[in-house]
Structures are given as structure tokens and as C-alpha cells.
């Protein structure tokens, strides 16, 4: 009787432990716990006041492909579970936008008040150099729970990305010297084009900080190539806390404040840059003081479409799941 009871107990232990062992093996094959090193590189886009209003116009205008910009960097990735990994990314790149992208649609309009016409006539452009670092969580929904499903065992997986980041940007814009006719990129942060930080200007916005927080959100598709290599395609959007990535946010200020707060040479450049509607395009003359230059209700953002490659190191520790 005692021997029989022991056999039944051993059989029960084996019955309960076998699924756990099988699941552990399957989980290890799917995504072992451990460290990965990799890189990403792809196309970058700025979403702000400068440029087009719609996403479709952004990508389909006939001038977009003339000046593509890119971003890339390195990453360290640690797999906590087949469905969850944490990543540390460091990236550098440039983003760009121009009101010239509205020309194609502006030509079709019959009213000067049309948004395409107004944007094109504003005549602004912007290029930002960006350094960023972010800590993000990578969530693979099809590998959450059971590892027995066909979806969980697939080499190719869709994943979601979310986290927090910190970045530094330096905005540039094209400036044409009226004396020489030479056009070049100049830094515009120190020109305070909307009066930021001007203490003698009523209602002036706070001085712009070039260091900002961001919330990265993304979606991607990755595929295992052998035991260690992984390659994927990822779209990542960075929601920022500033409306000055493109140097345009609110209203046209009285140009006298440039003379009161900047050197004579800086003031001359600032006057030319803050209101570029004087360029003979569709609307002649300058914008009235106090009229809208941008939309202060929406912060700027930027995004990337990147190829992601990383190498998974073999872990010596056992999985906890």
C-alpha cells in the first residue's frame, strides 16, 4: 500500500512538472532571457507647424523626396520574458520640414485664405540636429501567456514599443544674405524669433530650452535569422513637450523687440527670418504684428521608419518562466 502510494505521488509530480519543463524549453527556444546589442538606421520626419497639415500631403508632395533626412544609432536590449524586453537606445540624426511642400496644392486654390496658400506664403523651413537617448519597453503580444500556439512559435513577430526619452535639438533655417545673395543654414535659437525670453516684451513666452523630454511610442515587425541574429522594421513616433522644434509656435511679434534685445547684426537677421512673407510668392508684404505664425495648441513631434538589427548573446542563466 505504501509503495503504491509513493508511485501515485511520483506519477502526479511527473504529470504536473512535465508541462512546465516543456513550456520552459519552448520559451527558451522562442526568446531566451539575456542581452542583445544592435543598431538601427532609417528615415526621419518632423511633425510641426512648418510643412504640410496632413500626413498624406507630407509624403506625396513632389518636393519631399528632394531632401530626405535620416536617423540612426545603437541599442542595448535585455529580454526579460518572451513577451517583454527593455531597451536603451542612443541615436543621432536630422529632421526637416519646409513650407515649400505646399506649393503643389497651393497652385490649385482660388482663395488667398486657403491653408495651403497661407502655409506656402509663410515661407519657413527648418532643419534640426538631434541627439536622443531613450529607455523603452518592447512588448510582443503574441508571446504573452502560452508558448504552445502557432503564433507564439513564429520566427516573425509584431511588437509594440513605449517608454521615455531625453533629447537635445539644434534648429537651423536657411538665410539669404541680402548683400551677397548667398544662402546658408544658420542657427535660429539665439534669434528668439517669437520673443522667447524677452523680459521687456509683454506676454513673451519663456526662453526655449534645447533639452527636452519625449515619450517614444512605436510598432515593429522583427524576424529571427538563426539562433542569434534578429532583423526588423520599426516605426517610432516621439511625442515631445515643446512646440519649437520647427521654430514656429504662436504669433508674429513687433520687430522692434529684436532691436531692443539683440545685437544689430542679429536683429537684422531675426527680422528677415521671423517673417519671410516678404519673399514675392503668392502674398506680397509682411504679416501683421499679432497675427498667427503657428498653432500653439499642438506640440511638435518627430518619427522614424528604421531597419533594426541586433545580435542575441547566449545566456548562461536559466529562465525564470
Residue spans for each PLM region:
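Outer-membrane beta-barrel strand-turn architecture
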Residues: 31, 78-82, 141-143, 168, ...
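Residues that define the transmembrane beta-barrel architecture of outer-membrane proteins
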Residues: 33, 68-70, 129-133, 156, ...
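Residues on the lipid-exposed face of transmembrane beta-strands in outer-membrane beta-barrel proteins
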Residues: 39-43, 74-78, 88, 135-139, ...
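Surface-exposed strand-loop-strand hairpins of Gram-negative outer-membrane beta-barrel proteins
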Residues: 43-71, 75
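Repeated loop/turn-to-beta-strand initiation elements of outer-membrane beta-barrel proteins
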Residues: 47, 83-86, 144-145, 228-231, ...
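Extracellular loop and loop/strand-boundary signature of outer-membrane beta-barrel proteins
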Residues: 57-62, 119-126, 146-149, 201-207, ...
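Gram-negative (and chloroplast) outer-membrane scaffold detector with strong preference
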Residues: 82-186
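Predominantly the C-terminal beta-signal and adjacent terminal strand-loop region
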Residues: 226-321
Amino acid at each position: 500500500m505504501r509503495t503504491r502510494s509513493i508511485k501515485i505521488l511520483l506519477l502526479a509530480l511527473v504529470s504536473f512538472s512535465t508541462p512546465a519543463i516543456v513550456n520552459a524549453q519552448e520559451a527558451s527556444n522562442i526568446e531566451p532571457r539575456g542581452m542583445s546589442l544592435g543598431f538601427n538606421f532609417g528615415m526621419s520626419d518632423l511633425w510641426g507647424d512648418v510643412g504640410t497639415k496632413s500626413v498624406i500631403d507630407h509624403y506625396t508632395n513632389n518636393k519631399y523626396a528632394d531632401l530626405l533626412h535620416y536617423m540612426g544609432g545603437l541599442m542595448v536590449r535585455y529580454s526579460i520574458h518572451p513577451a517583454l524586453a527593455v531597451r536603451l537606445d542612443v541615436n543621432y540624426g536630422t529632421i526637416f520640414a519646409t513650407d515649400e511642400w505646399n506649393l503643389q496644392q497651393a497652385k490649385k486654390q482660388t482663395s488667398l485664405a486657403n491653408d495651403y496658400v497661407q502655409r506656402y506664403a509663410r515661407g519657413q523651413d527648418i532643419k534640426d540636429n538631434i541627439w536622443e537617448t531613450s529607455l523603452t519597453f518592447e512588448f510582443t503580444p503574441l508571446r504573452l501567456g502560452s508558448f504552445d500556439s502557432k503564433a507564439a512559435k513564429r520566427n516573425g513577430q509584431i511588437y509594440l514599443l513605449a517608454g521615455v526619452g531625453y533629447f537635445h535639438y539644434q534648429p537651423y533655417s536657411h538665410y539669404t544674405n541680402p548683400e551677397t545673395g548667398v544662402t546658408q543654414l544658420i542657427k535660429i535659437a539665439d534669434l528668439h524669433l517669437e520673443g522667447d525670453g524677452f523680459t521687456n516684451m509683454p506676454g513673451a513666452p519663456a526662453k526655449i530650452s534645447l533639452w527636452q523630454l519625449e515619450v517614444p511610442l512605436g510598432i515593429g515587425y522583427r524576424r529571427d535569422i538563426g539562433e542569434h541574429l534578429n532583423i526588423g522594421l520599426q516605426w517610432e513616433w516621439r511625442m515631445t513637450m515643446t512646440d519649437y522644434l520647427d521654430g514656429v509656435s504662436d504669433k508674429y511679434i513687433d520687430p522692434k523687440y529684436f532691436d531692443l534685445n539683440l545685437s544689430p547684426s542679429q536683429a537684422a537677421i531675426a527680422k528677415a527670418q521671423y517673417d519671410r512673407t516678404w519673399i514675392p510668392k503668392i502674398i506680397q508684404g509682411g504679416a501683421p504684428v499679432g497675427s498667427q505664425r503657428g498653432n500653439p495648441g499642438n506640440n511638435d513631434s518627430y518619427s522614424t521608419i528604421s531597419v533594426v538589427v541586433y545580435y542575441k548573446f547566449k545566456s548562461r542563466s536559466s529562465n525564470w518562466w
